[in-house]
Every structure is written in structure tokens, then in C-alpha cells.
Amino acid sequence: MAVAAVKWVMSKRTILKHLFPVQNGALYCVCHKSTYSPLPDDYNCNVELALTSDGRTIVCYHPSVDIPYEHTKPIPRPDPVHNNEETHDQVLKTRLEEKVEHLEEGPMIEQLSKMFFTTKHRWYPHGRYHRCRKNLNPPKDR
């Protein structure tokens, strides 16, 4: 049994050598077409293919090419204060002009009373007299 297994492994290895022969350090496939296609010249990386010493792994090395500073452009960044379009900065932060305005309590209470159809007294805070007399531990309902 052991001899048959060794022969089968040896024969399998020879079959793989015939199916995937190595020529000049590159993998040469007899039965399949290669899917490798050369990249255009203006592509931003150099591709190099290699085979490991045991012949089992194909290694692809593709470092990015350095672009000279003369060929770059600055990223346009619109001013968030004077830009009419809604930007990410405007969504997360209030505009600088709105920060200058002092928020008063009067208009907010009027807006809330109009929005919820209530009187203005509902939105003012309770005084100390009423807060002291509030029962903090009310009895549970049955």
C-alpha cells in the first residue's frame, strides 16, 4: 500500500510538471490561456511576476509609482462659511455666522408653543417652590 501511495504521489507530481512547466523562471501553462494582460503605460504601478524557488507559488509585486509634484493639483476645498451648497462641514457644525447670534429664550418658547398648539407657560421651567414640593417617590399603582 505504501509503495502504491508513493507511486501515485510521484505520478501526480510528474503530471503537474507536464501540465504546468516552468520555462526561464516563469510559469508556462500548456492547457490554459494566461489571464495576464499588460497594463497601460500611464497606469500608476509597475507589475512584476515571479515564481518561488519551490515552484508552487506565483508572486506578484506591484509597487505604486511615485508621481512628481509638478504633475499634481491641489484638492479644491470650498469655504464652508460662504459656500451655498450644503457640505459635510455645514451639516456637522453650525455656520460661523449663526454662532455669533445670541439665542434668546423668547423666540424658542414661542416656536414650541406654535408647533405643539400649547400655551407659552408650558415651556418655562418650574420654580424652586414647585420643585421642592414634588413627590420624588410616588406610590406605585396597583
From Swiss-Prot:
Keyword S-adenosyl-L-methionine annotated: no
Keywords from the UniProt entry: Mitochondrion, Ribonucleoprotein, Ribosomal protein, Transit peptide
GO cellular component, one term: mitochondrial inner membrane
InterPro entries, alphabetized: Ribosomal_mL42
Pfam families for the chain: MRP-S32
Compartment annotation: Mitochondrion
Transit peptide feature, positions: 1-32
GO molecular function, one term: structural constituent of ribosome
Signal peptide: none
GO biological process, one term: translation
Complex and partners: Component of the mitochondrial large ribosomal subunit (mt-LSU). Mature mammalian 55S mitochondrial ribosomes consist of a small (28S) and a large (39S) subunit. The 28S small subunit contains a 12S ribosomal RNA (12S mt-rRNA) and 30 different proteins. The 39S large subunit contains a 16S rRNA (16S mt-rRNA), a copy of mitochondrial valine transfer RNA (mt-tRNA(Val)), which plays an integral structural role, and 52 different proteins.
Protein family per UniProt: Belongs to the mitochondrion-specific ribosomal protein mL42 family.
Protein name per the record: Large ribosomal subunit protein mL42
